[in-house]
Amino acid sequence: TIARAHAKFGTTALLPTLISDDLEKIALAIEAVDAAIEAEVPGVLGIHLEGPFLNTSRKGVHDASKFKVLDQEAIELLTRLKRGKTLITLAPETAPPGAIAELVRRGAVVFAGHTEASYEQIIAAEAEGLRGFTHIFNAMSQLSSRAPGVVGAALSSPTSFSGLIADGVHVHVANMALVARLLGPKRTVLVSDAMPTLGSDQDWFELKGEKIFARGLTCYTPDGVLAGSNLSLHDAMGVMMRQVGIGLTDALQMASHAPARAIGLEGQVGRLAVGARADFVQLDGDSNLVRVWQRGVQL
């Protein structure tokens, strides 16, 4: 399973991600995750629905023909998961007024991504309960002198979380350092954005009929467009320590406690505490992964 593949790299809990697709496919994905949690499949915390309520101008490798309007029917579908957490990435400027608030009221965690929103639109979305930003600097309106955009809103927010793809390619090292400095280890969330090549002997896969190739820690289309990563969270920690210069303690927090806080599970995962899951790793003196425990069992 996806969870088992990531666990051997030290990621003991995750949200499997479905990118933009038909509502029928989304319904099936939610049912599959619900069944996995009911069966107590180790490591599955819920689901991340990245789309299809995105902005075509920031589509990345998403199929824009799948993009839809966030109506009441869609809201009811997106919040159908009975067990675990639902993280939804959407473009706030495409959401009708009150839609984000309704998603949050129904228990979803909402992040902004693949968005051309203005600073003001993000502030309005935060007032409805927007909690963070999926891939800071990627597929979003950038910071400029008179238009702070999504990036400006994310970096100036005192409370929101920002997911960071720390492969050294998606985001320039200077910008990675800026995120780490402004948001700190408590709100900088290392994300893998990992594709099926991670942990596989194969260096390519097909996405919607197009071949995607893994080169180092990053995945690309044949035209050189970024298409996710070949990155584990342990890899991301290494990049942050080597290239950005943060310490091991902060890197560990960005890969564990911060993600757990971002989705409201800080009491269950992401830290060693009474009552929390016994998920932890052993690193050597050079921060190499030595052993992994999941629910108290060594893998």
Identify what each model region corresponds to:
Residues 75-200:
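Active-site core of metal-dependent hydrolases
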Residues 149-163, 168, 180-192, 197-283:
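His/Asp/Glu-enriched, well-ordered alpha-helical/loop segment
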Residues 295-296:
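Glycine-centered positions in the ABC transporter ATPase nucleotide-binding domain
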Residues 28, 32, 77, 102, ...:
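Alpha-helical scaffold segments in soluble metabolic enzymes
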Residues 4-15, 56-82, 124-136, 140, ...:
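Active-site gating loops and adjacent loop-to-helix segments of metal-dependent hydrolytic enzymes
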Residues 26-39, 100-109, 247-252:
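Short, electropositive alpha-helical surface patch
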Residues 20-23, 27, 68-72, 93-97, ...:
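Electropositive phosphate-/nucleotide-binding environments in soluble metabolic enzymes
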Residues 1-29, 43-55, 82-93, 108-109, ...:
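Divalent metal-dependent hydrolysis catalytic cores, especially in the metallo-beta-lactamase
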